[in-house]
Design a protein with these regions (language model features):
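Secreted/periplasmic carbohydrate-active enzymes, especially glycoside hydrolases
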Residues: 1-95, 101, 105-109, 140, ...
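Substrate-binding/catalytic cleft of secreted carbohydrate-active enzymes
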Residues: 73-81, 86-299
């Protein structure tokens, strides 16, 4: 059978003969055999529930919308290397060669009809509700289906994107289900209406996903058609999403927005190249969305952004936990759907904090898909000079595939091992005479001295603001709300102060520039026996003023 992990293909040969039995035409194509369905409320391939580890992909190159075969090959190679198993063709059917690549090398595909009327909104003016546009909706749906229906990579049909919902999408859904009942059909704007087999809302929070899967009698899986929004410094919340996907059967992943930055390289008058964005072309003042076109996991020439490494790590299909530190016993979970871990080799080592290899080895592991297995690597005696060590696990393929070589690390884990407490190499030194002063009006740490020398250039106060990322500036719940609440201009006012010989406890109001209280903060300052000052801060926002905050701590 065909799957993204084992894309088994066969060659179908068709011969056309005339009435006399003579062959007049011969043609052929690659075909694969697999099932795609919603079974017991879960999205399944070949009867097996799978997690969608996906991304959205626009067609983009330095030639514009014309994408070469070589660039498509580069795209699929990178996706396979970075543990992506699904691609959504956003927001239109793409070059036929892309389908052949996904069939051949193994990517699940969500093929999307070229229907988007975003500018008309989702209300009564939506074209989805106007039956005079039914023929246009049906025509684009028919063309998508009939052109590509035999590709095994297409496991889900998408009716379109951000075009409202109404009679026209109900009819396109009905038609798709009439010609092919099994393969799932999704449409984000249908939400929980009947004309979608998957609840595929975009950019829902972790709490919203938990609320959905916690309901009784749900019969559709939650698979986000878009999530994370990989613009600039991003993807920091991915771990929390996947803690839900890996523990809630009805939450089955999603497709990151998106794969590639849609901008161009230009050369300036000094011969240096730079990226262009919206506003760099056309007359001055022409409307644009600025750098909003740059929200990919890779840049426009397919160089990975740093957050693609986060995606690779979280999407990896082999994950381990350390259950016995003394004997280096690890519990390994196989998240592959159709692959035994005996297709991979485990290389492990223990390194000291200076990178010295203290022990190493290789291991073959037999573990069926979705199963777990305990593996004991054996106790390692650490030298007396080692204060801290690290157990590193690295997985690679035993045999190369066309896109993934045997030297490519497909998964890794690292665990901290406690070294010797009484190491001869490191002995605590006395910190000298340390003293601190807390301002009695603000509660701020106003002075910290060591042997009489001041260490602070200015008092240390609570900060609830930081430079905004691209997503912070775009997000309606981001930096604009932080500024509206005045979190970028704060003062402190002591409510209570308790001082002891080596500690101080402060409770303070936190005020914005308008004098409004945005919350209460508790500070605990404490010197330890070595002279180190430890500060613990707790902040409780006033939700009447503070509607959103940057992550703290």
């Amino acid at each position: 059978r065909w799957s993204a992990e084992h894309p088994n293909l066969y060659t179908l040969v068709l011969e056309l003969k005339n009435a006399g039995g003579q062959v007049t035409e011969v043609t052929g194509c690659e075909v694969g055999f697999r099932t795609s369905e919603i079974k017991d409320g879960r999205f399944c391939i070949n009867g097996v529930p799978v997690l969608v580890k996906g991304t959205n992909r626009h067609e983009h190159s330095q030639l514009g919308r014309t994408v070469s075969k070589e660039l498509m090959e580069q795209d699929i190679r990178l996706m396979k290397l970075y543990n992506i198993n699904t691609v959504r063709n956003s927001h239109y059917p793409t070059d036929p060669y892309w389908y052949r690549l996904c069939d051949r090398y193994g990517l699940y595909m969500i093929d999307e009809a070229n229907i988007e009327s975003h500018g008309m909104g989702y209300g009564p003016a939506s074209l989805a509700k106007d039956s005079t546009w039914l023929t246009a909706h049906m025509d684009r749906t028919h063309r998508m289906y009939e052109r590509s229906k035999n590709h095994p990579a297409i496991v889900i049909w998408s009716q379109g994107n951000e075009a409202g919902n109404g009679i026209n999408f109900e009819r396109t859904y009905d038609w798709l289900k009439s010609v092919e009942k099994g393969r799932p059909v999704q449409y984000e704007r249908a939400e929980l209406n009947y004309n979608t087999d998957i609840y595929c809302r975009m950019y829902r929070s972790v709490d919203e996903i938990k609320a959905y899967v916690g309901k009784k009698d749900i019969y559709r899986p939650f698979i986000l058609c878009e999530y994370l929004h990989a613009m600039g410094n991003s993807c920091g919340g991915m771990k929390e999403y996947w803690e839900v996907f890996e523990n809630e059967p009805m939450a089955q992943g999603g497709c990151i927005w998106d794969w590639v930055d849609q901008n161009f390289r230009e050369i300036d008058k000094d011969g240096k190249w730079y990226w262009t964005y919206g506003g760099d072309y056309g007359p001055e003042g022409i409307p644009s969305f600025g750098n909003f076109c740059g929200n990919g996991l890779v840049n426009a020439v397919r160089e990975p952004h740093p957050h693609l490494l986060e995606v690779k790590k979280i999407y990896q299909n082999i994950k381990a936990t350390l259950s016995d530190r003394k004997n280096l016993k690890v519990c390994i979970k196989n998240w592959y759907d159709f692959s035994n871990l005996n297709e991979y080799i485990l290389r492990w080592n223990v390194k000291g904090e200076d990178g010295t290899v203290l022990a190493e080895g290789t291991k073959e592991v037999d573990c069926e898909p979705h199963a777990t297995v305990d593996v004991t690597l054996g106790a390692v005696k650490l030298p007396n000079t080692v204060r801290e060590a690290y157990l590193n696990l690295s997985w690679s393929r035993k045999e190369a595939t066309p896109l993934v070589d045997t030297d490519w690390e497909v998964a890794y884990d690292q665990f901290v091992l406690a070294g010797n407490k009484n190491t001869t190499a490191y002995r605590p030194q006395k910190a000298g005479e340390t003293a601190f002063v807390v301002d009695k009006n603000t509660g701020a740490l106003s002075s910290l001295t060591l042997d009489g020398k001041e260490l602070l250039a200015a008092p240390i106060t609570l900060s609830l603001f930081r430079p905004a990322t691209d997503n912070d500036n775009r997000d309606r719940n981001g930096a604009r709300l932080w500024r509206k609440a005045g979190l970028n201009n704060l003062t402190q006012k002591v409510v209570s102060l308790k001082e002891e010989k080596t500690s101080a406890t402060v409770r303070a109001e936190i005020l914005n520039g308008k004098g409004q209280k945005v919350g209460m903060a508790d500070f605990v300052y404490a010197l330890d026996k070595n002279g180190a000052l430890k500060v613990r801060t707790t902040f409780q926002p006033d939700t009447a003023i503070v509607k959103s905050m940057a992550r703290l701590g």
